[in-house]
């Protein structure tokens, strides 16, 4: 995969970690960047600055130590509030502003934000023009193919975005009504790529190196946005990059490497959030890492009862030590994709 440009920034590849609330915090962004992502995007930050004093919001706006270019996603339904939020995030260190018009969650859509905005093309235009006009950094946009299957206006929204000065567009191959059910479709993304000259990223169900190549061929997209498939599997970026570059499938990481990556991730979560919050947030990540391994369900029940950082680390080490004994060491056992 060739390098991809977003404004003045040249990415090492077109593989992007999609913004996911409660997932793509700074420790996970740093990890995915080390393991091959060309760009990592922050968790969604509300455009309502009156809510920025919560600890959750403050943690989401820590950009010091983030891999560059620092991309921050904002969400909301008011053009002026989004413009103000974009400006404030740039002052805090954001180098790219990403606008969320793709989240299908009810708590977002019920506030006329996320993919709910696709219903109102005039408002879309107003928001994009306001944000692009408010900052001197590239502004990118994430959308879905439409509101529902009878209202697939992704192509129209893409043209509005290009006219407003959006630098790059990511398109999830489902409508808002689809949520995450069924299979993503890529025909709409292909039509959008044909119709606009800005950078286009395809998103949806990209869970393997082979699928990544098929989606690129089907859409003609410049790159790929990868979200849920990276949960517990941050090495998916290097797997895809290697396959696209060489045509060879990288073997799954051996257990010793999975243990090392997981322990590094645990340590980063504990350091970033502190003992109490770090322990709580680590639980879901550990569950994702171990989901495909025998005994994971029982281990997760045990792990989720732990409330100290040292206990979490020790228990993870014990889990992998037990695996080594049951499987033998050096047998090339890896974690399935």
Regions from the language model: what does each represent?
Residues 34, 83-113, 121-198:
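Alpha/beta enzyme core
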Residues 1-3, 7, 11, 15-16, ...:
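Alpha/beta catalytic cores of nucleotide-metabolism and tRNA/nucleoside-modifying enzymes
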Residues 118:
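Aromatic- and acidic-residue-enriched carbohydrate-binding clefts of CAZyme catalytic domains
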Residues 20, 45-47, 75-77, 102-104, ...:
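Active-site beta-loop-alpha junctions enriched in small/polar residues
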Residues 2-5, 20-95:
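Glycine-rich, positively charged N-terminal anion/phosphate-binding segment
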Residues 4-16, 48-71, 103, 108-111, ...:
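N-terminal small/glycine-rich loop or linker at the start of catalytic domains
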Residues 15-19, 40-42, 70-74, 97, ...:
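Hydrophobic faces of well-ordered beta-strands that scaffold small-molecule active sites
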